[in-house]
């Protein structure tokens, strides 16, 4: 068996990110063979990753990449359990490598990316002690595609017919700030309109009580029209110049907004509420496993 030197332990620590005692034990078990020790630790890491899989990952990062000719772009969301991990270099590297893979392979769905990156994901989970997941991915191709990334938490892709990359980015910035639900009023679903009507009637029950039916209908119509304008990108006042609507801005530049995609970290994920004492107890219990 090769001698287990301090230098060997140090090298294994640097290559795996694991603790000194874990590295020493792995080297002893592997007979001093560092490559075998790494393989064994990865196998062990896969087990740890499986244990972490049930933990809710609602933090993380959004990443975007646009082609040099602005004809295509990809946006992905990768989740972690804490925002702290999302700011660490190992996590950032995993996100960047995943984005490059998705872009290079022209992926339109997250499933093949998840499968391809599973080994790297398990290694990251084993190293950082948090659950990590590639959640979703969207690829957009068109005449002019632009993107905007707000920090690491909000990302937007905008697809234009006509126009230019600068306009696409400006509109993407607006989408990030204003969070429109639909492109235009014609795309608003009947379910969304019905829900808005129901909410309006419930909130204004006292005001409309005893009023004639036609008056109530006009009140509802006014609220629905306001909702359609607020929820539709093309009808929203442009954030940089509220005097012009986003749709008009595009039209003046000889462009038409074809579609947009907006990702925000953790949206739609139900995050469990855990009190601090319980969280500490859970971490202590996990450290003893």
Swiss-Prot record:
Localisation: Cytoplasm
Any single GO CC term annotated in Swiss-Prot or TrEMBL for this entry: cytoplasm
Involved in Mg(2+) ion dislocation from EF-Tu: annotated span: 82-85
Keywords: Cytoplasm, Elongation factor, Protein biosynthesis
Predominant cellular place of this UniProt entry's protein: cytoplasm
A GO molecular-function annotation: translation elongation factor activity
Pfam family, one: EF_TS
InterPro entries cross-referenced by the UniProt entry: EF-Ts_dimer_sf, Transl_elong_EFTs/EF1B, Transl_elong_EFTs/EF1B_dimer, Transl_elong_Ts_CS, UBA-like_sf
CDD domains, per the entry: UBA_EF-Ts (cd14275)
Membrane-spanning ranges: none
HAMAP family for this protein: EF_Ts (MF_00050)
NCBIfam families: tsf
Family: Belongs to the EF-Ts family.
Xref: PANTHER family: ELONGATION FACTOR TS, ELONGATION FACTOR TS, MITOCHONDRIAL
Role: Associates with the EF-Tu.GDP complex and induces the exchange of GDP to GTP. It remains bound to the aminoacyl-tRNA.EF-Tu.GTP complex up to the GTP hydrolysis stage on the ribosome.
Name recorded for this polypeptide: Elongation factor Ts
Annotated gene: tsf
């Amino acid at each position: 068996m090769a001698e287990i030197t301090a230098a060997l332990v140090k090298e294994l620590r640097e290559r795996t990110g694991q603790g000194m005692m874990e590295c020493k034990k792995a080297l002893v078990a592997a007979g001093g063979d560092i490559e075998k020790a790494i393989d064994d630790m990865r196998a062990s890491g896969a087990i740890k990753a499986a244990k972490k899989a049930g933990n809710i990952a609602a933090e993380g990062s959004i990443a975007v990449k646009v082609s040099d000719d602005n004809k295509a772009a990809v946006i992905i969301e990768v989740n972690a359990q804490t925002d702290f991990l999302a700011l660490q270099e190992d996590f950032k590297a995993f996100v960047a490598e995943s984005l490059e893979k998705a872009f290079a392979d022209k992926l339109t769905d997250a499933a093949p990316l998840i499968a391809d990156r599973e080994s790297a994901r398990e290694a990251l989970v084993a190293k950082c002690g948090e659950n990590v997941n590639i959640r979703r991915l969207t690829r957009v191709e068109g005449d002019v595609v632009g993107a905007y990334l707000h920090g690491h938490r909000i990302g937007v892709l905008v697809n234009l017919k006509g126009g230019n990359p600068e306009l696409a980015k400006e509109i993407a910035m607006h989408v990030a700030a204003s969070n429109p639900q639909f492109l235009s009023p014609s795309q608003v679903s009947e379910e969304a309109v019905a829900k808005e009507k129901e909410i309006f009637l419930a909130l204004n029950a006292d005001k409309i009580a005893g009023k004639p039916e036609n008056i109530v209908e006009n009140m509802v119509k006014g609220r629905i029209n306001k909702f359609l304008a607020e929820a539709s990108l093309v009808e929203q006042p442009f954030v940089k110049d509220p005097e012009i609507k986003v749709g008009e801005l595009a039209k003046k530049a000889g462009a038409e907004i074809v579609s947009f995609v907006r990702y925000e970290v953790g949206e739609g994920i139900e995050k469990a509420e855990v009190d601090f004492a319980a969280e500490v107890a859970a971490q202590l219990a996990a450290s003893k496993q």
